[in-house]
């Protein structure tokens, strides 16, 4: 999925006809490293402990569901003209996001709890809002960790983005779903039954809405540059994963009624927790797809983080940037550097950021991809700060070794 999106640029799609598009798609499917993609997903799931992260997000989501529902209901209550959008949103929740067996009980409980929120005082409402924001900040921290971002956005900017998503998101989704319901009603009024083509179109619309929402999450939340085609690849993975998980869980509950037998009427709670966990696992794997799409499209497998790898990457980056300056080039992008070094962009980014912190490399934040330029003179710049930061800490016990190895006298030119 990521290869299809990431290897087909917008100009290619506009210039190519339908036959060329199909041929390009078939070629991408044949050459895409599917096995490497599965290996990357498995490796990142294990090394980044995404299962534990999904459990944490499940717990936080359970606590924050009522506050989020309260905010949504408050928006619709403040504007009576949007009342019909609320009904469309509830219908979408039942039909699309949650398996049939638990959708109505969960929605009824959320609506009931959120409806009682007006009885709370000012302090209680503030706590509800802070709980909702805690979930959003947890998501922010998790996605930045997947993209290996060490410095998140400023707290005010993060709160503003998530608050806009929590308030405007349900409203825009409700408008879209209401227009969809109007189309269904009009179609039934004309032909008496919904045509199969219209049913497929509406299902595709629901699929696309979720994919677009996830793509927006992957594009805007990480404090790094994420191309839209990579974010959309992750969004499509999440949307497809939700459909498969929903049908699979519904089939399992129908065939193996273990929870209903043991828990009875209380079975909705453990089933819903399982669904939340599966949902977060799918979202996190979609984020991995979006984050590693650049390296996968270059047929590059992430190398193991052996001791000294970041130092090695920093030396290679300095060598490439020095060569680019000698050729008269105006800097290199992260993807270009990774392609030249045949390595994962996310794997060399920490070393590149360390060079920026040392003021040896400058980052140009212009339109398009960020570019990096070499600022220092390798012939006169001492290598000691880089050696101390990424290779060997000059502690008192190693001072003699540093002197014998002449680390303090070494320049960058001797390294590169």
From Swiss-Prot:
The protein's UniProt keywords, in alphabetical order, are:
Cell inner membrane, Cell membrane, Membrane, Transmembrane, Transmembrane helix
| GO CC terms in record | plasma membrane
Among Pfam families, the record links this protein to: Virul_fac_BrkB
What membrane topology is annotated for this entry?
A: Multi-pass membrane protein
Question: Which InterPro entries does the record cross-reference, listed alphabetically?
Answer: UPF0761_bac (IPR023679), Virul_fac_BrkB (IPR017039)
Where, per UniProt, does this protein localize? Cell inner membrane
Name the domain of life: Bacteria
- Which residue windows are transmembrane per the record? 63-83, 120-140, 159-179, 198-218, 234-256, 271-291
Q: Where is the signal peptide?
A: none
Keyword Transferase (UniProt): no
Q: Which family does it belong to?
A: Belongs to the UPF0761 family.
What protein is this chain from? UPF0761 membrane protein Mpe_A1422
**Organism source for this protein?**
Methylibium petroleiphilum (strain ATCC BAA-1232 / LMG 22953 / PM1)
């Amino acid at each position: 999925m990521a290869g299809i999106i990431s290897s087909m640029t917008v100009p290619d799609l506009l210039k190519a006809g339908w036959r060329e598009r199909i041929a390009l798609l078939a070629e991408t499917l044949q050459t895409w490293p599917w096995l490497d993609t599965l290996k990357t997903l498995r490796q990142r799931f294990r090394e980044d402990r995404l299962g534990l992260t999904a459990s944490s997000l499940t717990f936080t989501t359970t606590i924050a569901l009522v506050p989020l529902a309260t905010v949504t209901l408050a928006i619709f209550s403040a504007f009576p003209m949007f009342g019909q959008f609320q009904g469309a949103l509830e219908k979408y929740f039942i039909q699309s996001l949650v398996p049939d067996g638990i959708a109505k009980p969960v929605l009824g409980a959320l609506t009931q709890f959120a409806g009682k929120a007006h009885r709370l005082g000012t302090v209680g409402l503030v706590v509800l809002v802070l709980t909702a924001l805690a979930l959003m900040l947890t998501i922010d921290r998790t996605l930045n960790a997947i993209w290996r971002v060490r410095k998140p956005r400023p707290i005010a900017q993060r709160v503003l983005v998530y608050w806009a998503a929590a308030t405007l998101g349900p409203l825009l989704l409700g408008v879209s779903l209401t227009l969809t319901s109007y189309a269904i009603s009009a179609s039934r009024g004309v032909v008496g039954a919904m045509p199969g083509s219209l049913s497929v179109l509406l299902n595709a619309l629901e699929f696309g809405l979720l994919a677009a929402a996830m793509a927006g999450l992957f594009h805007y939340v990480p404090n790094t540059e994420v191309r839209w085609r990579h974010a959309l690849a992750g969004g499509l993975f999440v949307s497809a994963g939700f459909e498969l998980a929903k049908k699979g869980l519904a089939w399992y509950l129908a065939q193996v009624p273990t929870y209903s037998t043991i828990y009875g009427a209380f079975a909705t709670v453990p089933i819903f927790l399982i669904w939340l966990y599966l949902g977060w696992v799918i979202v996190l794997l979609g984020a991995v797809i979006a984050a590693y799409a650049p390296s996968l499209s270059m047929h590059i497998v992430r190398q193991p983080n052996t001791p000294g790898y970041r130092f090695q990457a920093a030396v290679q980056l300095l060598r490439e940037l020095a060569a680019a300056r000698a050729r008269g080039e105006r800097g290199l992008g992260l993807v270009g550097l990774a392609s030249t070094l045949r390595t994962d962009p996310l794997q060399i980014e920490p070393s590149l950021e360390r060079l920026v912190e040392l003021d040896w490399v400058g980052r140009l934040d212009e339109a398009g991809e960020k570019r990096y330029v070499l600022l220092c003179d390798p012939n006169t710049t001492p290598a000691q700060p880089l050696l101390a930061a990424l290779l060997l800490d000059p502690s008192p016990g190693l001072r003699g070794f540093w002197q014998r190895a002449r680390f303090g006298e070494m320049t960058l030119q001797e390294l590169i």
